[in-house]
């Protein structure tokens, strides 16, 4: 199987099967635009927005999911679920918050829908059922509202909390 070289933002080069790399719509489009469709090339494809540690994780995820069917198109009317993350992905995403957020940014930049979906669902699950104070604590967010501002926001959004 032909391979391609991917270069991370910090200069590390990864040799990857072309079919695995093409799970990224961004890389697939680059290869098509450069006329490097399947024959491979010695010049690495630069990925200036992804460092080596994160690119290594992305390649690991893509390798595991190489035989998956393409993810379905989003249906605007369909309710989004966050309880359908495969066990392998749950284990794979047991990383620190910084790494998780870097994976979201990389999946978005590289346009890998399946990875973007599971990383965002993981963050959604970290938020689900928590109070604003618990969410702030989880994500180390400083509350910069004055007491008056907070009271005003609570008043305006009171309907949200009614059960």
Curated annotation (Swiss-Prot):
Entry-annotated residues carrying Phosphothreonine: 131
Region entry Disordered, spans: 63-83
Positions of crosslink type Glycyl lysine isopeptide (Lys-Gly) (interchain with G-Cter in SUMO1): 142
Annotated spans, Interaction with the F-box domain of F-box proteins: 104-163
Pathway, per record: Protein modification; protein ubiquitination
Keywords: Isopeptide bond, Phosphoprotein, Ubl conjugation, Ubl conjugation pathway
MF GO annotations: beta-catenin binding; cullin family protein binding; F-box domain binding; molecular function activator activity; protein domain specific binding; ubiquitin ligase complex scaffold activity; ubiquitin-like ligase-substrate adaptor activity
GO BP annotations, alphabetical order: chromatin remodeling; maintenance of protein location in nucleus; proteasome-mediated ubiquitin-dependent protein catabolic process; protein K48-linked ubiquitination; protein monoubiquitination; protein polyubiquitination; protein ubiquitination; SCF-dependent proteasomal ubiquitin-dependent protein catabolic process
Pfam families, per the entry: Skp1, Skp1_POZ
Family: Belongs to the SKP1 family.
Role this protein plays: Essential component of the SCF (SKP1-CUL1-F-box protein) ubiquitin ligase complex, which mediates the ubiquitination of proteins involved in cell cycle progression, signal transduction and transcription. In the SCF complex, serves as an adapter that links the F-box protein to CUL1. The functional specificity of the SCF complex depends on the F-box protein as substrate recognition component. SCF(BTRC) and SCF(FBXW11) direct ubiquitination of CTNNB1 and participate in Wnt signaling. SCF(FBXW11) directs ubiquitination of phosphorylated NFKBIA.
Protein name in UniProt: S-phase kinase-associated protein 1
Organism: Rattus norvegicus
Taxonomic placement: Eukaryota, Metazoa, Chordata, Craniata, Vertebrata
């Amino acid at each position: 199987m032909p391979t391609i070289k991917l270069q991370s933002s910090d200069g590390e080069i990864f040799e990857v099967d072309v079919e695995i790399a093409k799970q990224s719509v961004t890389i697939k489009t680059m290869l098509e635009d450069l006329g490097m469709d399947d024959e491979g090339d010695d010049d690495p494809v630069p990925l200036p927005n992804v460092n080596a540690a994160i690119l290594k994780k992305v390649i690991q995820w893509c390798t595991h999911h190489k035989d998956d069917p393409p993810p379905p198109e989003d249906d605007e009317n369909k309710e989004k679920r966050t309880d359908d993350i495969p066990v392998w992905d749950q284990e794979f995403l047991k990383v620190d918050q910084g790494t998780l957020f870097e994976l979201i940014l990389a999946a978005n930049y590289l346009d890998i829908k399946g990875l973007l979906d599971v990383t965002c669902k993981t963050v959604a699950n970290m938020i689900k059922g928590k109070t604003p104070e618990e969410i702030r604590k989880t994500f180390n967010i400083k509350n910069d509202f004055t007491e008056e501002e907070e009271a005003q926001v609570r008043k305006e959004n009171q309907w949200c909390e009614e059960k």
